[in-house]
């Protein structure tokens, strides 16, 4: 699927692509079910939650499962800063795409260098000439490398500071994956973020993933400027000069309570205070 997008390929003004959330941890997949509006979960054209291994997901895609139809996908690698594929979901990528030869090729595509946590690099698998990778690619066109740890030497999560070590890194990784998704894909496969070696509790990870996904799916029902404001308050960087009057007027039109927005506490408050569910169903 290539070429320019027309209005029929847009959802709320953003490119329609199926989001496939995939994880082996049932706690994670159940939390996704709870935190993402049912209107999206029930409409598998836009979102699917897969409880199981990457291999089982790929098997269903290879069989032409109607839920996973599509010709070109990207998959998120939420690993380390050096591109090693030694654990967690990255280990599944390692095994699926060809083991050590694939890891060597993948790291070469990343320049063999350090990539900062919070960065994102798109790797085109069509450039890989490894026989096993070519054989198993099955529509996976890209890997989006989104480091969540420098190295898996110790958990990043500190229960004394859940915002900076949990909510924020997960949101940044999810937002980066969505913002860097190539334009010529039908779908994006994303595992649970930071719930493995990074040690972020699933309830925190899933909340930030759901918030990023809601912002993305809201499309042009929420202006870019207001999205910036919502992110600023979700991550608890309250700075009034970055909250323009136009966004306050927009909040009133969308039914977002400005005072509740300004006092939003990510540890206690529901994300519906920032993005009312009705906004997400306007074009479904």
From Swiss-Prot:
Homodimer. Keywords: Disulfide bond, Hydrolase. One of its GO terms (biological process) is tRNA splicing, via endonucleolytic cleavage and ligation. Substrate binds at residues 23, 55, 80, 90, 148, 195. Pfam families: Macro_2. The active site is at 80, 90, 145. GO terms for molecular function: hydrolase activity. Highly specific phosphatase involved in the metabolism of ADP-ribose 1''-phosphate (Appr1p) which is produced as a consequence of tRNA splicing. + phosphate. This is Probable ADP-ribose 1''-phosphate phosphatase YML087W. Its EC number is 3.1.3.84. It catalyses: ADP-alpha-D-ribose 1''-phosphate + H2O = ADP-D-ribose + phosphate. InterPro entries: Macro-like_dom, Macro_dom, Macro_dom-like. Residues 34-230 form the Macro domain. Disulfide bonds join 128-136. CDD domains: Macro_Appr_pase. It is an enzyme of class 3 (hydrolase). It comes from the Eukaryota. It comes from Saccharomyces cerevisiae (strain ATCC 204508 / S288c) (Baker's yeast).
